[in-house]
């Protein structure tokens, strides 16, 4: 949404992917998961003509006419996993194990509450299983927020949790655990900014 005014008449294509990679200690990129890529436009336009040749380079790909829902589901998922793994210094899979399972479930419930208030009930209903599936399938992975925090870099906390708390709905419900996680990561980000 922020980029749209900057591009004039050009068509803005946005997307989400479940593919992932990380840098090795030597700076090489290592594929940590091959997944699905979804693209679309915010105005629900049909697929552009350039898509056919582009599709050949991306194995599991889909054009989505409702990309907003795809992006919201991804933000909701990341709002649960990323701050917890970053602040606790754990892998994705550890979130579904004691002692972190209880707080993970609390955060899921708070994000679901935000989604329901914004009338995104289907995304809210799917969130618990989506979190479990991602934590299982990427059990050994480190979230990007954890990598950024441990590397002394600024995180995407504002674009993920900050956006959910501030922009999803005009009157958000109480989210004490999620808000506390947001504040803790923000504080670390501020320290990075000052350094």
How does the language model describe each region?
Residues 28-38, 86-96, 141-151:
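Helix-loop-beta segment of a Rossmann-like dinucleotide-binding subdomain
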């Amino acid at each position: 949404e922020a980029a749209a005014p900057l591009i004039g008449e050009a068509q803005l294509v946005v997307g989400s992917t479940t593919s992932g990679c990380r840098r090795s200690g030597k700076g090489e990129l290592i594929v940590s998961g091959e997944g699905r890529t979804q693209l679309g436009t915010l105005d629900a336009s049909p697929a552009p003509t350039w898509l056919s040749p582009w599709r050949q380079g991306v194995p599991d790909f889909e054009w989505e006419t409702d990309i907003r829902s795809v992006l919201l589901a991804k933000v909701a998922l990341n709002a649960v996993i990323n701050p917890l793994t970053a602040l606790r210094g754990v892998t994705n899979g550890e979130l579904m194990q004691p002692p972190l399972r209880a707080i993970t479930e609390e955060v899921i419930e708070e994000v679901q509450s935000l989604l329901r208030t914004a009338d995104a009930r289907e995304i809210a209903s799917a969130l618990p299983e989506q979190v479990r599936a991602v934590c299982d399938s990427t059990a050994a992975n480190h979230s990007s927020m954890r990598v950024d925090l441990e590397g002394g870099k600024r995180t995407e906390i504002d674009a993920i949790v900050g956006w959910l708390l501030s922009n999803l709905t005009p009157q958000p419900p109480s989210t004490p655990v999620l808000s506390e996680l947001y504040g803790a990561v923000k504080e670390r980000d501020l320290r990075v900014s000052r350094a």
